[in-house]
Amino acid sequence: MRNLISWLFPFLLTAFICTAVGQSAPSSCKQCAEWNRPQKPFRIFGNTYYVGPRGLSSVLITSDAGHILIDGALPESAPLIIANIRELGFRIEDVKIIVNSHVHSDHAGGIAELRRLSGARILASKWTAAVMRQGGVGRDDPQYGSITGIAPIKKKVEELHDGETFKIGATSITAHLTPGHTPGGTSWTWKSCEGDVCHDIVYADSLSPISAEGFRFTNSRTYPEVLDDFEKSYKFLETTPCEILITPHPGMSNLWDRLEARQRGTMPDPMVDGGACRELAVKARAQLHQRIEEEQKK
C-alpha cells in the first residue's frame, strides 16, 4: 500500500495543483467558459497534436528528445492541457520549449503554470517577452485598456529573432514575426511527417483588427506602424509554404470542420489545404479594410 501511495503521489500532487490553479485564477471575459470547454486531444499530422481546450489552440510537437508546446490558452486551461498531453501518452515534464503566438490572457495565460510544471524554456519576441515579464497588457497593444492582462512570468523569458529556428531532437520550429494584432505577434512553421509523407505546418497568429474603444488603426499614436505591420504579416501568409494551417482560435482556420470531415473518412485528408494561408490573408486584409473604412467615416 505504501509503495502504491508513493507511486501515485506525483500524479495526485499535479492534479491538486492544477485544480487549485483553475479555481483560483479565473479569467474575466464573457467567452472564457465557452473557449475553455474540454476537447479530446488528437493527432493533427505526424508528431503534431492538438492539446488545447475547444476554443483555444495549444499544439504539442513531439520528439524523442523532448517536446515543444505552442500557446498556453487561459490560466484555467493549464490543467486541461496537461491532462490532454497525458492522455496522448506524453508528459508535461518532457516539454522543453514553450512558445506563444501573442501575449493576451487567452493564449498566454496558462504559460506560467505550464512552465512551472515542465521547467521548459519560454521563447518569445522582444515585445512579447517584455509584456510577459511585467504582466498586464502592453501599452501599445490595440486592445490596451479593454482586456484582462496576464500575470507576470517570474522565470526567465528568452527573446527570439525573426526567422530564428529552434531544434529539439529531429524537430525544428521557426519563428516568424507577424505583428498587427499585437506588436509582438509571432507565427510558427515546421514540418511533420508520417512515413515518407511530410507537410509544411503553419501556426499563424491572429491578424484581426480588434481594439479598445477609441483606438484608431489609421492614425494610432501608440502604435503608428500598425498598418505596415499588418501588411507585412499578410505577405508572410501569402508566401510561406503552408499545407496545414492552425490558428490560435481553431475556428478561424475551420479546424473542427476539417476534423469532422476527416473522421467521416473524406479523402484526400481535409486537414491538408495548400491554399489555406493565402485564404486567411485575404480574409484578414478584408477585415482591416472594412475597419479603415469605418474609421474614415467618423
Language model: regions and residue ranges:
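Positively charged n-region of N-terminal signal peptides that target proteins for export
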Residues: 1-6
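Bacterial N-terminal signal peptides
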Residues: 7-19
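Divalent metal-coordination and catalytic microenvironments
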Residues: 47, 61, 71, 102, ...
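C-terminal regulatory/interaction regions
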Residues: 271-298
